[in-house]
Design a protein with these regions (language model features):
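Membrane-interface interhelical loops and short interface/amphipathic helices
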Residues: 94-141
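Transmembrane alpha-helical segments in integral membrane proteins
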Residues: 139-174
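Amphipathic, cytosolic membrane-interfacial segments at TM-TM junctions
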Residues: 56-69
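Transmembrane alpha-helical insertion/packing segments
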Residues: 1-59
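Short, charged juxtamembrane terminal tails flanking transmembrane helices
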Residues: 1-4, 170-179
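C-terminal halves and exits of single transmembrane alpha-helices
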Residues: 74-97
Length: 179
C-alpha cells in the first residue's frame, strides 16, 4: 500500500481491535478497565511513530511540519475510527456491557458525592446525574450513536496533539543524529 498513514492506520486498527477483543473474551470487566483502555494508546503511538519515521525517510525530514504531521494524524484517525466502530458494535451485540458501564459510572458518582464536593451546586448536579443513571439502569439499555461520534470527534483533537508530539520527537531525534 502506497499511503504510509493508511497502511499503519489499518494495521493499528486491527491491532487495537484484537487487543480489546482479547480483553473482552478474557473478562468483560477488563474491557471496561480505564487503565487497560489507556494502555491501548501504546499501539496508537507505536504505529504513529513508525509511520512518521517511514514517511520521513521517503519524503525527507526537513519538510514543513504541517506536511510531516499528516501521516501520524491519519494513523491516529484510522485507528480511532476502528476502535469506536468496534466499541459500538460490541455494545450493540452485548447490552450487558452498557449495564456494567452504567453501574461503574453510578458507583463512581456516588463515591464522589460521599467524599464531598464542597460546592452545593455541584453536589445537586451530581445528585441529578445519579438519579438519571438509576432510572437508566432500570430500563433496557441501548448504546446511542451520538455519544460515540462525540467521543470520536473530541479524541481527534487529542490525536492531533499526539501526532504533533510524535512528529516533533522524530524530527528532534533526526536532528540529533545529524549533529
Amino acid at each position: 500500500m502506497k499511503n504510509i498513514g493508511v497502511r499503519y492506520g489499518l494495521l493499528g486498527g486491527a491491532a487495537v481491535i484484537f487487543y480489546f477483543l482479547l480483553l473482552y473474551m478474557v473478562r468483560k470487566d477488563l474491557f471496561l478497565s480505564p487503565w487497560l483502555q489507556w494502555a491501548s494508546l501504546l499501539i496508537y503511538l507505536g504505529c504513529m511513530y513508525r509511520a512518521t519515521k517511514e514517511d520521513g525517510v521517503l519524503h525527507g525530514y526537513q519538510r514543513d511540519f504541517r506536511m510531516m504531521v499528516r501521516a501520524p494524524f491519519v494513523v491516529f484517525l484510522l485507528i480511532n475510527i476502528a476502535y469506536w466502530l468496534f466499541y459500538y458494535a460490541l455494545h450493540l451485540t452485548d447490552p450487558e456491557l452498557l449495564r456494567m458501564e452504567t453501574a461503574l459510572d453510578l458507583t463512581f458518582k456516588k463515591q464522589q458525592l460521599t467524599a464531598g464536593l464542597g460546592d452545593p451546586q455541584e453536589a445537586n448536579q451530581l445528585r441529578e446525574q445519579i438519579l438519571a443513571l438509576e432510572k437508566q439502569a432500570i430500563q433496557p439499555l441501548v448504546q446511542p450513536l451520538g455519544p460515540i461520534l462525540f467521543r470520536l470527534a473530541i479524541g481527534s483533537i487529542g490525536g492531533f496533539l499526539l501526532a504533533a508530539g510524535v512528529t516533533a520527537l522524530v524530527r528532534s531525534g533526526v536532528a540529533e543524529e545529524n549533529r
